[in-house]
A protein has these predicted regions:
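Short, well-structured hydrophobic secondary-structure segments
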Residues: 37-93, 209, 214-228
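C-terminal edge-of-domain segments
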Residues: 81-95, 101, 109-110, 115, ...
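Catalytic cofactor-binding cores of redox enzymes
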Residues: 115-120, 124-133, 273-301, 306-320, ...
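Phosphate-rich cofactor/ligand-interacting catalytic cores and adjacent structured alpha/beta frameworks
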Residues: 162-235, 258, 296-436, 462, ...
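Long, hydrophobic/aromatic-enriched structural stretches that serve as scaffold segments
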Residues: 218-240, 252-298
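Short, amphipathic C-terminal "tail helix"
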Residues: 440, 444-476
C-alpha cells in the first residue's frame, strides 16, 4: 500500500462516527423537506475510502441519479470527507419508485456493484434492497462472505481497482464511439461524408463509417486499459509519488505501455480495414481519439492530481493527450501518405495538433458552444458543422494537400474562414455550395473530420462535469 493510502486510512471509529452524523443529517433534511431522500455514496471494502477513480465512479452515480430524477429534485446536500464523498437528494416522488430506479442505476453501470444508493422514506426508514448484494469476487451473497471473511482485504482491493479501471476504459471508449457517430452525421460537411452524400469520396458512406466505428471501439477501451494498468500502481488511481513526465524519463507512460499502445493501434486499423473491405475510414481518428481516450482515463485516475469535481475536463484532457503524444516516434521518412505530404509541404497536420494538445479541437468546441448561445439554439445550421469551419480555416490538412495541392488547401482555408465570419448569418445553402465545390475539386478534408470528432469527444467529457454545478444550485 502506498504512503498516501496509508495516510488516508479510515478507522472503524471514524466510520462509526460518520454513520451517526449521516443519520442526523438525513433526519434534518427529512424534517425540512418532507420528501423521500436518495442517498449516494460508495461501497468500498478496506480502510481506504477515497481515490481518484473511486470519486470518478461516485460522480457517475450522481450524474445518473440527477438525470433519472430530473425535474423532481427539490434539495441537494454534498459531503466531502476522508470517509468518502456523499450526496443527498430530496426527490418529489414515491419512495418505492425511487428505490427501483436507484437499483436500476446500480445495475446499469459496470462499476455499479460499488454504488451504495439508499432511499429513505418520509417515515425515516431505509427501504430494503429487492435483491441482496453479490460478492465482488465470487458472486455469492456479499453479507455471507463478509461475515466469514472469505476474501482477504488485498483480494478485495485488487478486484475493486480492476473493476474501476475497466469501467473507465469502457466508458471513454463509448464516448469515442459516440463522437465518431456524431461526426459522420453532422450535415452538411463540405467535401466529407455526411447524411447527404459521400463528399469527395467514392468508396465510403455514412453506413460504412458506422460499421468502422463498431469495429474500432473495443480497441479504444484496450488502449485506455493499457494506460491505466501502466500507471495506476495505487489501489484506485495514480500512486502517491507519481510526478508527471519525470516518472518515466520524460514520458507520461513507460516505454512498454507506449509499445503496447502502438500495437493496439495497428490492430485497430486492421479491424477497421476488415470491416470496411479495405477502406480507410478512421485511421486518423484511431490516432487522435486513441490519445484522447487514454488521456481521459488517466485524468479520471488522477493524472493531474486528485481533482474530484473534475472541472474544465476538455482542456485538461487535451493537455494530457498532448503529453501522451510526445511519447510516440513519428518518423518523417515513413512511407505513409501522411508522412509523404508532411515532407513535401513541411507541415505537421494531426501530429502537430496532437503534440500541442489539440488546440483546434478546443477551438471547435468553443465555436460549437458560441454558435448555440448566439443563435439561442435555433441556428440555421448544425452547430458542429459551423465548428468544422473553424478547423478547416486553420488546419494544415494532409488530406486537402494530397488531393488539392497547395492551391487547393489554400482555397479550403479561405472559403472556410469567410463562411465562419458569417456566424449565425451562415446558411445551409452556403455550406452546400462549399460542399459542391469541394466535390468538384475532389478535395476531402479528412484531417478536419478527425479533429471534429476529437472536439465532440472533449465536449461530451465536459458535459459530464456540469451536473454537479447544476445540482449545487438546488436548495430547499
Amino acid at each position: 500500500m502506498s504512503r498516501e493510502n496509508q495516510m488516508n486510512n479510515v478507522g472503524v471509529f471514524e466510520m462509526a462516527e460518520r454513520r451517526e452524523k449521516r443519520a442526523a443529517e438525513q433526519q434534518d433534511m427529512l424534517a425540512r423537506c418532507g420528501l423521500p431522500l436518495v442517498c449516494i455514496n460508495m461501497n468500498i471494502a478496506g480502510p481506504v475510502k477515497r481515490g481518484a477513480l473511486i470519486d470518478w465512479a461516485f460522480f457517475r452515480a450522481l450524474n445518473a441519479a440527477a438525470n433519472i430524477f430530473k425535474g423532481k429534485i427539490r434539495g441537494f446536500a454534498f459531503t466531502d470527507e476522508k470517509t468518502g464523498i456523499e450526496a443527498m437528494l430530496a426527490v418529489d416522488a414515491a419512495a418505492e419508485s425511487l428505490k427501483k430506479q436507484a437499483e436500476s442505476i446500480e445495475k446499469e453501470f459496470p462499476e455499479g456493484r460499488l454504488f451504495d444508493i439508499d432511499v429513505i422514506g418520509t417515515d425515516g426508514l431505509k427501504l430494503s434492497r429487492n435483491v441482496p448484494r453479490k460478492c465482488l469476487i465470487c458472486g455469492q451473497p456479499a453479507a455471507a462472505c463478509a461475515r466469514s471473511r472469505t476474501h482477504s482485504a488485498e483480494e478485495l482491493r485488487k478486484a475493486t481497482a480492476e473493476l474501476l479501471k475497466n469501467a473507465a476504459a469502457q466508458h471513454y471508449s463509448e464516448l469515442a464511439a459516440q463522437a465518431l457517430i456524431r461526426e459522420v452525421h453532422t450535415t452538411p460537411k463540405p467535401g466529407l461524408v455526411d447524411e447527404n452524400n459521400s463528399g469527395a469520396n467514392d468508396d465510403m458512406d455514412a453506413a460504412l463509417f458506422e460499421l468502422s466505428t463498431e469495429a474500432v471501439q473495443p480497441f479504444f477501451a484496450q488502449m485506455a486499459k493499457i494506460a491505466l494498468d501502466a500507471v495506476c500502481t495505487a489501489a484506485f488511481g495514480f500512486s502517491g509519488d507519481f510526478s508527471g513526465s519525470a516518472a518515466f524519463g520524460g514520458s507520461i507512460l513507460p516505454n512498454g505501455a507506449v509499445s503496447c499502445l502502438k500495437q493496439t493501434g495497428i490492430l485497430a486499423e486492421k479491424a477497421m480495414l476488415t470491416a470496411t473491405g479495405g477502406v480507410n475510414t478512421h485511421r486518423g481518428a484511431i490516432f487522435s481519439l486513441g490519445l484522447a481516450v487514454c488521456a481521459a482515463a488517466l485524468s479520471a485516475a488522477g493524472a493531474e492530481g486528485h481533482l474530484p469535481l473534475r472541472e474544465n475536463a476538455a482542456e485538461r484532457i487535451a493537455k494530457l493527450a498532448g503529453k501522451l503524444a510526445e511519447a510516440f516516434d513519428y518518423e518523417r521518412n515513413s512511407g505513409s501518405n501522411g508522412a509523404i505530404v508532411r515532407r513535401k509541404y513541411g507541415v505537421g497536420g494531426a501530429i502537430e495538433q496532437a503534440k500541442a494538445g489539440f488546440p483546434l479541437a478546443i477551438v471547435a468546441k468553443s465555436l460549437h458552444e458560441e454558435y448555440n448561445i448566439e443563435s439561442n439554439g435555433q441556428g440555421s445550421v448544425d452547430s458542429w458543422a459551423f465548428a468544422l469551419l473553424g478547423i478547416m480555416a486553420e488546419l494544415e490538412d494532409n488530406n486537402a494537400l494530397k488531393r488539392g495541392g497547395d492551391a487547393g488547401a489554400r482555397f479550403v482555408k479561405r472559403r472556410a474562414a469567410f463562411l465562419l465570419s458569417k456566424r449565425t448569418m451562415l446558411t445551409e445553402a452556403e455550406l452546400l455550395d462549399f460542399d459542391d465545390e469541394l466535390i468538384r475539386r475532389g478535395i476531402s478534408c479528412g484531417g478536419a473530420a478527425d479533429m471534429l470528432a476529437a472536439a465532440i469527444f472533449l465536449s461530451l467529457a465536459d458535459e459530464e462535469q456540469r451536473v454537479f454545478a447544476e445540482l449545487s444550485k438546488t436548495t430547499l
